[in-house]
């Protein structure tokens, strides 16, 4: 019984440093910027580690094209590429901070945003 109390006490005493580490990870994630591209760079989309689109570039040659569907497909592909990279970068930050723990199960509890 006392061992369980001791273990619980150790967990509580480490919560402060864990909380600090998670705050540091949140700051690093907020500063992450990744670029997804499609059409050999004709469309690029920048996303933050938080999964927000921060920039979209479309080569002006695509505006002259008669095929809007192609442009739509390229924007969608570049966006999905950027969001995938952001998710991977975020998962890496969490795993690095946790000593390699897999956060995929914990992430599911938070809507799947972190790995």
Curated annotation (Swiss-Prot):
Pfam families: YbaB_DNA_bd. Keywords: Cytoplasm, DNA-binding. Gene3D superfamilies: Nucleoid-associated protein YbaB-like domain. The keyword RNA-binding does not apply. It is found in: Cytoplasm, Nucleoid. One of its GO terms (cellular component) is cytosol. GO terms for molecular function: DNA binding. NCBIfam families: DNA_YbaB_EbfC (TIGR00103). Binds to DNA and alters its conformation. May be involved in regulation of gene expression, nucleoid organization and DNA protection. Belongs to the YbaB/EbfC family. Homodimer. This is Nucleoid-associated protein LA_4332. It comes from Leptospira interrogans serogroup Icterohaemorrhagiae serovar Lai (strain 56601). The lineage of its organism: Bacteria, Pseudomonadati, Spirochaetota, Spirochaetia, Leptospirales.
């Amino acid at each position: 019984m006392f061992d369980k109390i001791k273990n619980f006490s150790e967990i509580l005493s480490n919560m402060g440093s864990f909380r600090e580490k998670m705050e540091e990870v949140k700051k690093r994630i907020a500063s992450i910027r990744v670029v997804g591209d499609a059409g050999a760079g004709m469309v690029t989309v920048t996303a933050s580690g938080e999964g927000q689109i921060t920039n979209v570039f479309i080569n002006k040659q695509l505006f002259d094209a008669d095929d809007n569907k192609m442009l739509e497909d390229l924007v969608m592909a570049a966006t999905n590429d950027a969001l995938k990279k952001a998710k991977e970068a975020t998962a890496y930050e969490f795993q690095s901070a946790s000593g390699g723990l897999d956060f995929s199960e914990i992430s599911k509890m938070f809507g799947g945003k972190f790995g």
